[in-house]
Amino acid sequence: MFMNDQVYDLLRQAVIASRTLVDMSNKTIKNILRNTADHLLENQNTILEANAEDLSRIDPSDQKYDRLKLTKERLQTMADDMRSVAVLSSPIGKVLHEITRPNGMLIRKVSVPFGVIGIIYEARPNVTFDVFSLCFKSGNACVLKGGSDASLSNHALVNIIHQVLQKYRININTCILLPPNREVTAALLGAVGLVDLIIPRGSSSLINFVRNNTRVPVIETGAGICHTYFDKKGDKDKGRAIINNAKTRRVSVCNALDCLVLHRERLNDLPYICGDLQKNNVIIYADEPSYKVLVTCYPANLIQLAVEESFGTEFLDYKMSIRTVNNIREAIDHITRYSSKHSECIVSESPKTINFFLQKIDAACVYANVSTAFTDGSQFGMGAEIGISTQKLHARGPMALEELTTYKYLIEGSGQIRS
């Protein structure tokens, strides 16, 4: 068993490593990240073998399976995202505000790294690479606590990172992978003074556990209970494409659609709007008005009457609910009640209705005529993301380089003293 003292010894090494990153040039960081991306692809067979062994312990019907699975295409995406991060400008040392006081004192507010960032995540080995690239680029050491389901995949990926760091004679404790034991999680959450920030990424139960048990500051990457409101002035072709994409592109991700909110005047368009959902065997939990329409045309084994639990659920599966409303205000009320404040969408051709929706919906990402599948750091031009924050303090939405920095004030003078 890994003891607390062993965890704290590793964290102290991460603190030491984080101090060495301050002096590293952006050019060196860029070269290391590019080399790591190349090294990943050169060793993809090794990674896929480790991943296959992890997958062999999971039922393919389990929601975790798709999140855990790595393919050559996904490894290519991971490498591309790392290269995208590499070429971004450094978020460190930026002058955020500058003022010269009447007494001649110069005050500058300058961006700096947090120091050591702990990431707790589940069966998502791609997170390992995303986290390292973003933390390294922003001058932070990262401490990774992955789930046991992905332990072999994570270990293989961190080995790739360490091999490149050693090539450049960089302290490998810049990126530490902790054992996947629960006792280690408790030690990490109590590491005040060693870890500057914890970011949990995973299920609502994981996030709630971290929130309720940590002594270290946390930025939550919350569950995604996502809605799309199809307005009475919505384009049915756009709506069909957006709804299907948001639901079926990848059902296991946090930006996937969970509930279609439908204006009552568009009930007759529902069979057309749901046409692609039927092709993808999406199970629909429909309220009474939408059920009466769909029961005549949607496969009987894929349609059920909704109950209260059908709403406010993050399905992470080929399942969704439908709620019928009389107007935009009812739509907003429903979304406000059940939303996790992640990503919400309206499909409408009315500028007035769109603006009202964008202003009134309280979520990290609010879309008009765009699939919620775009809530992603790479799609926002950030290179990659460390998670989607659903809280409001410090960071909200896709968290990338800027969100992994804090700031300090630099004050210069010529001998000023305060009266």
From Swiss-Prot:
Stored Gene3D superfamilies: Aldehyde Dehydrogenase, Chain A, domain 1, Aldehyde Dehydrogenase, Chain A, domain 2
UniProt-listed SUPFAM superfamilies: ALDH-like (SSF53720)
One term under GO cellular component: cytoplasm
Domain of life: Bacteria
Cellular compartments annotated: Cytoplasm
Coiled-coil segments: none
Disulfide bonds, paired cysteine numbers: none
Pathway this chain belongs to: Amino-acid biosynthesis; L-proline biosynthesis; L-glutamate 5-semialdehyde from L-glutamate: step 2/2
UniProt EC number: 1.2.1.41
Record-level Gene Ontology MF annotations: glutamate-5-semialdehyde dehydrogenase activity; NADP binding
Family: Belongs to the gamma-glutamyl phosphate reductase family.
Protein role: Catalyzes the NADPH-dependent reduction of L-glutamate 5-phosphate into L-glutamate 5-semialdehyde and phosphate. The product spontaneously undergoes cyclization to form 1-pyrroline-5-carboxylate.
Protein name, UniProt field: Gamma-glutamyl phosphate reductase
Organism lineage: Bacteria, Pseudomonadati, Bacteroidota, Bacteroidia, Bacteroidales
Protein encoded by which gene: proA
